[in-house]
Amino acid sequence: MRNGRWLVAGAAGLVLAAGITYVATAGPATAGHPAAPRPASKPTPLAVVAVTPADGAAMVAPDTQVQVTASGGMLTQVTVASGDSAATGQYGPGSTSWSTRWGLKPATSYTVTVVARNSKGAATTEVTHFTTKRASRILQVSSITPSSGETVGVGMPIIVDFNYDVARSDRAAVERALEVGSDVPVTGAWFWASDSEVVFRPQSYWPAHERVLLTAHLTGVPGGPGLWGGSDLSYSFKIGDSHLVKVNLKTDWARFYINGSLARTIPVSGGMGGYDSFGNDFYTTSGVHLTMGSYDSVWMTSPNIKPGQPGYYHELVYDDVQISDSGEYMHQSPGGWWCLGHENCSHGCVRMTADGAAWWRHTAYRGDPVIITGTPRVLAWDNGWGYWQESWSAWLAGSSAGPVTTTALAEASLGAPSAGPTSPAASSPAPIPTTVG
């Protein structure tokens, strides 16, 4: 018995002496049989990170998209920073990719810091640097209509004027950088009214009581040779009650609707029609006008006619609401009360009763649609804010990026807007019009 026990122990000693190091990981043993050994598991590789632009890159175009990818793991942190500011970006599916959403500042050094983790949680950290090229000119917004915080009508456009002309090849990029948000998403499009002015209009009127936010992500946006956007800005305004005015100059009556219900019916008198020897057209324009401002009073002067010549006048007219750039207003009739509701007697404006004109001046927002019918003269789309004169297909033809859907605003989306240039709301006194009365 003693010899047998020694032999078993010796056998075990022979196994150990053979230098086999994986006995501890062996599977379960059965009676009379030693456990089978298993090889040790290999360590999980670390995630591999790739960054574009490459480390040390210089003269990077400001509209370059920074792209980060991770293979064999997930991205858990990405920052593209310059000083205290960081570029906005978004992760791709599965957090294996990340890219900047908007442009970069010109002539700026950026540091990219990336952390990725493999399936075991082990981290890979990558830090790279690059520098963007300098701009010879900086594209900026010089004015925006309506004013920040203003309450406007359902037809109100957003009019953005730039300090430089924008090249046709870069207009789509500029449009995409002008992000419009609203409580209820609507379809709309930007339209280039000139080389330096772009206008946003919904396909249909804005819903009443809507908040609207414009965010101009202009940083790093190209505008032409050597022209790059240098900074962002945002501002908001509100759509008020729905005001819709229908003026029929065949019957000489105007109907005013508020939130879909008829609020008032007012007798009016439009342009008398015809032309004078000075080339003045005395027809009121038909079409979809927008109210452009309200005034206590406006001095109205006959265009192209000097004092002492037939047809000259220069008179102060009260309770004025401007509806075009060719001198058309809705206002209190300065006389000829018998014409209201019966005959067109004015030089092109829409005359109203004293109480009706005062009520409308105090009720109207900028951007209220005023639809005038019954005359042979048609409002041009570029006469004031005649943008609704363009069909939707014609409006899209003036866009480089095509239709967009406004971004739905969260309840907290409208914080304090950044300071930006806006056009002032109209106030008395108004500029002297070219066609009046």
Residue ranges and their predicted role:
Residues A116-R117, L218-G220, G260, S297, ...:
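Short, charged beta-turn/beta-strand-edge "cap" motif at the junction between a beta-strand
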Residues N3-D241:
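Acidic, low-complexity Ser/Thr/Gly/Pro-rich repeat segments typical of extracellular/periplasmic
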Residues D161, D165, S169, S297-V298, ...:
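Structured segments of extracytoplasmic/periplasmic soluble domains
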Residues S119-K120, K133-A135, P207-A208, S261, ...:
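A short, structured loop/turn motif at beta-sheet edges
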Residues Q90, F191, L262-G271, D382-G384:
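Short amphipathic beta-strand/extended segments with alternating polar/hydrophobic composition
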Residues V154, D241, Y283-S286, T301-G437:
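Exported/periplasmic cell-wall-interacting domains
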Residues G226-W338:
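Gly/Pro-biased beta-strand-loop elements
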